[in-house]
Every structure is written in C-alpha cells, then in structure tokens.
Design a protein with these regions (language model features):
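Solvent-exposed soluble domains appended to multi-pass membrane proteins
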Residues: 79, 84-88, 92-95, 99-258
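Membrane-embedded alpha-helical bundles of multi-pass enzymes
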Residues: 1-53, 88, 95, 253
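Short, glycine- and charge-enriched coil/turn segments that flank and shape catalytic ligand pockets
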Residues: 21-30, 54-60, 145-151, 165, ...
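Beta-strand-turn-beta hairpins that frame and shape the catalytic cleft
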Residues: 54-68, 207-218
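A broad, low-specificity signal for short, low-complexity segments enriched in glycine/proline
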Residues: 24-30, 66-68, 178-182, 203-205
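Transmembrane alpha-helical segments
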Residues: 37-52, 62-75, 245
C-alpha cells in the first residue's frame, strides 16, 4: 500500500514537472528516467507475481463464495422499525444466490443492525439461513462485553457454520481514529465534551483467523484493509482466504467510496 502510494505521487510529480519545464526537458530528465525505470520494474514484478498466483490457484482447493450487498440506506439502517425489513432483504438475496453446499456467504460490516449475540427473533432468522443453504455465513454485527467497569462495545464479524452455530468471531482490532475511538481520551478527559458523538469502541485482541472446515479465513473489517501488515500476518498464520467486510453507506451518494 505505502509503496504504491509513493509511486502514484511520484509519477504525478514527474508529469507536473514535465508540464512546468516543458521548454527545458533536460532539467527533469533524471526524474523522468527514474520514473520509467520504476514503472518498468513494477510491471515486470507484477507479471511475475500474477503468473505465480495463477499457478498456485490452479493447485488450490476451490470454494464458492456469494457476496451479498443489501445497500441499506444509513439514514434508516439503525431504525428499529426497519430491522426486520433489512434482515429479510439479506435473507432473500442469500437464499437466491447461495452456493448451496459448504460454500461461503458474505454480508457486509454491521449487516445486522442489532446485537446478534442477544437471543431474539431476528438473530434466529440469521442463524437459520446457513441451515437452509448448508453454507457458512460471515457477517458484521455490533457486539458488547459486560465488564466490572461497565459495558465495552466492539465492531465484530461472526462466522456461522452450516448448522447455524457460531463457529468463530473476530473483533476489529485496528479502529478508526475519531470515528470508532478518540486518541488520548484517557489522558485528556475534557475531550469527551468536545467529541460527544464519537464512538468509543473496544479494540479486539488482534489477528485471529476463523476456521472453515479444514481452512483458515482471515477477516478484515473496513479500515483495516489499508494496513498490509494485517493481511501479511493472516497469511503467515496460514489463512488461505482474506475477506474484507465494509460498510461504506456512511458516505452516502458521494465519490468517497470510490
């Protein structure tokens, strides 16, 4: 991620200098040559990597995956009056496009706009979906942990087995600053008055692969996808599939998600 960001910025700087110094190309020739060499090396390495990945894919065991995107408007998502409608939408879409046999169905981050861990009719509906399709179901849900000092909230991903039981859970460990927590809040209590609307989530315990049969699944939640070290850690721990579940509905009809 960081290296690619550098290359994008560097190439744009070279193009800018070519325009500014178009009457004196010799002045920007060194950086132009450097840019061309970097792009050539990246292209060559990319081709080599793609060929290696194709070879590994041909040898790997396949799993059918269905990605379900409900496109629930953020303005109504957390309204209790629309919870049943949201889950019914995900249920219908999942049943329509399910792998039907030990595949994987993936819903987005916070797809269940309630605490799935609490026994309820809607939680039972969600648990019943993998039973109907005989597939695994991965989805995001808010969660909480009652401790002596109070209740801690997490941004979590749950994995349900084909029998509808919770096979694993991952709590987001790399939280969004000023979105899911406020840095230094413990040391500067007065910040609470300035950012009352900001979430204060509990950080998860770090990289934790979820087991699907004989395979390990690496789960990343939204913002965690920009940190390559997280994906690398999953790979080093044996994960054969990485899944990033995200809710970009916060951005509404803007260019931000793109």
């Amino acid at each position: 991620i960081y290296g690619l960001s550098f290359v994008i910025v560097f190439v744009n700087v070279v193009l800018f200098d070519l325009i500014v110094y178009r009457e004196n190309i010799k002045k920007v020739f060194p950086e132009l040559a450097t840019g061309c060499i970097i792009l050539a090396l990246l292209f060559g390495y990319g081709q080599f990597s793609l060929n290696r990945i194709r070879h590994e894919l041909n040898r790997s065991e396949a799993m059918e995956v269905s990605l379900v995107q409900g496109n629930i408007d953020q303005n109504i998502k957390w309204n209790p009056d629309y919870q049943r409608e949201s889950i019914e939408l995900y249920q219908n879409m999942s049943l329509k496009k399910a792998p039907l046999g030990l595949g994987l169905i993936v819903w987005p981050e916070t797809a269940t706009p309630f605490f799935f861990q609490d026994p309820s009719h809607l939680s039972a509906v969600v648990r019943n979906i993998p039973k109907l399709t005989s597939d695994w179901l991965l989805f995001g849900s808010p969660s909480y942990l009652d401790e002596g000092s109070g209740t801690e909230y997490m941004n979590s991903a749950f994995l349900l087995s084909p029998d509808g039981n919770v096979a694993g859970r991952y709590d987001k460990s790399h939280l969004v600053p000023y979105g899911e927590y406020v840095p230094l809040r413990r040391f500067f209590p007065f910040i609470n008055k300035l950012v009352a609307g900001i979430g204060d989530f509990k950080r998860g315990d770090g990289v934790k692969a979820l087991r699907i049969g004989r395979h390990d699944l690496g789960v990343l939640i939204c913002y965690e996808g920009i940190f390559p070290e997280i994906s690398r850690k999953y790979k080093e721990n044996g994960a054969g599939l990485l899944v990033n579940i995200t809710n970009d509905a916060w951005f509404g009809r803007t260019s931000a998600p793109y």
